[in-house]
Amino acid sequence: MNPQLSPKAIREIREGTCNPLGAPQVTTDLSENIILTSLDDLHNWARLSSLWPLLYGTACCFIEFAALIGSRFDFDRFGLVPRSSPRQADLLIVAGTVTMKMAPALVRLYEQMPEPKYVIAMGACTITGGMFSADSTTAVRGVDKLIPVDLYLPGCPPRPEAIFDAVIKLRKKVGNESILEREKTEQTHRYITYKHEMNLVFSQNTGEYLNKTSTNVFPSSKKEKITELPENREQTEIINSEEE
């Protein structure tokens, strides 16, 4: 290499040798106004910023969800717009107990929602049946037996702050999805693989204990301490005067 060449000339010769086309030159104005991203990131950014929940409340948990609409919590800042039609919603928040009669309507609403769609199970009654799972014959023991659930939100009922936390976690899940891999990762099954085992216990309130001899026979030791009650008020006054 010629020692008389300047360092700048040597650098240009090396760049031309390594990359004959040269490095791409981007001006300062373009670098400050152009954002390089992928189609997945752009698509997910648009979806997670505009989750439209379907208003579906069957019990007291919906009162906490309705509080989000007010100015105190203002869930519009998350891009949540409540919808009354399943065809315009992509998020189903099941808030409250689901009964056997309401189960077909819930499944129908879920099937009418366009893809991609997400489900949040809100409250203990929605997740496991709650306090109605012990003796109710009409409560569904978990909404995941009917439709696939993406996020579980326990509580009785959950606070509005907990609903915000669930929405933020769902946004993170939406942001990590890929258009090409969505068919492989989405939940295609409706029913879960495990069952909520409920052991059948026979009722003990049969009334048989009333027919037992131990409940009908009065103890002889207590019979001696029982005195005859007075028939009228005059006899009561006489007894009281004798005691004085």
From Swiss-Prot:
Biased composition (Basic and acidic residues): 221-236
Chain coiled-coil ranges: none
Keywords: 4Fe-4S, Iron, Iron-sulfur, Membrane, Metal-binding, NAD, NADP, Plastoquinone, Quinone, Thylakoid, Translocase, Transport
PROSITE patterns the UniProt entry points to: COMPLEX1_20K
Name this protein carries in UniProt: NAD(P)H-quinone oxidoreductase subunit K
Database matches in InterPro entries: NADH_UbQ_OxRdtase-like_20kDa (IPR006137), NADH_UQ_OxRdtase_20Kd_su (IPR006138)
Pfam families named in the record: Oxidored_q6 (PF01058)
Keyword NADP: yes
HAMAP family: NDH1_NuoB
UniProt catalytic activity: a plastoquinone + NADH + (n+1) H(+)(in) = a plastoquinol + NAD(+) + n H(+)(out); a plastoquinone + NADPH + (n+1) H(+)(in) = a plastoquinol + NADP(+) + n H(+)(out)
Catalytic activity, EC: 7.1.1.-
Binding note for cofactor: Binds 1 [4Fe-4S] cluster.
Function field: NDH-1 shuttles electrons from an unknown electron donor, via FMN and iron-sulfur (Fe-S) centers, to quinones in the respiratory and/or the photosynthetic chain. The immediate electron acceptor for the enzyme in this species is believed to be plastoquinone. Couples the redox reaction to proton translocation, and thus conserves the redox energy in a proton gradient. Cyanobacterial NDH-1 also plays a role in inorganic carbon-concentration.
GO MF, one annotated term: quinone binding
Subunit structure as annotated in this protein's UniProt entry: NDH-1 can be composed of about 15 different subunits; different subcomplexes with different compositions have been identified which probably have different functions.
Cofactor: [4Fe-4S] cluster
Keyword Iron on entry: yes
UniProt topology in membrane: Peripheral membrane protein
Residues noted as binding [4Fe-4S] cluster in the record, renumbered to the chain: 60-61, 125, 156
Biological process according to GO: aerobic respiration; electron transport coupled proton transport; photosynthesis, light reaction
Family under the similarity heading: Belongs to the complex I 20 kDa subunit family.
Cellular component per GO, a single term: plasma membrane-derived thylakoid membrane
Compartments in which it is found: Cellular thylakoid membrane
Spans annotated as Disordered: 221-244
Species per Swiss-Prot/TrEMBL record: Prochlorococcus marinus (strain MIT 9312)
